[in-house]
Amino acid sequence: MARGATYKVQFKRRREGKTNYNKRYKLVDLDKTRMVVRITSNHTITQLVKIGENGDETLVSATSKNLKEFGWLGNGKNTSAAYLTGYLFGKKALNEGYDETILDIGVQPSIKGTKIYAVLKGALDAGLYIPHNDSILPEDSRIRGEHIAQYAESMDDDEKNAKFANYIRCGLSPEEIPDHFESVKNKIDEATQ
């Protein structure tokens, strides 16, 4: 391991896999605000971050936990919740006077159509300008949860009750997810005008 004078120990955050300093240096060098998106096992976190002398400064923040305030009955880890979190974030950022930013996904892999890009699409639909390529964004039907509704319709009741027990326990039928998504999006629009 650390034997000899030629061994160089990496920075702690690099060893832990939390920070890629090459990417971070390029983002810091741009001197623009960054939309930082982090996906945890249960929630989506989105922050508008500015570089400061004493470290990064968070200007605007939204998490999927905030969606409960607007009546979201689903969990915070699906694509619909990621989109709504990005949409809420975009509305908050515009209200604070920020209309342009760049995306910072950290060490997460960049895969087309994932929750990271659902957050990006939500922020874009809210009115933020973020440089991107349209081919990476997920489809609208997937964001609205139509694939879940179609899958639930093809199941019998016992199988549906077992598979979607958490949704049913919260009072949301899986077939109603697209309509519920639209109602929560409208509530976000009303609250952030």
From Swiss-Prot:
CDD domains: Ribosomal_L18_L5e
Disulfide partners: none
A Gene Ontology cellular-component term: cytosolic large ribosomal subunit
Cited Gene3D superfamilies: 3.30.420.100
Keywords for the protein's UniProt record, in alphabetical order: Ribonucleoprotein, Ribosomal protein, RNA-binding, rRNA-binding
Molecular-function GO terms, alphabetical: 5S rRNA binding; structural constituent of ribosome
A Pfam entry, by short name: Ribosomal_L5e
Domain of life: Archaea
One BP term from GO: ribosomal large subunit assembly
Cross-referenced PANTHER family: LARGE RIBOSOMAL SUBUNIT PROTEIN UL18, RIBOSOMAL PROTEIN L5-RELATED
Function field: This is one of the proteins that bind and probably mediate the attachment of the 5S RNA into the large ribosomal subunit, where it forms part of the central protuberance.
Family: Belongs to the universal ribosomal protein uL18 family.
Assembly with partners or alone: Part of the 50S ribosomal subunit. Contacts the 5S and 23S rRNAs.
Protein name: Large ribosomal subunit protein uL18
Source organism (scientific name): Methanosphaera stadtmanae (strain ATCC 43021 / DSM 3091 / JCM 11832 / MCB-3)
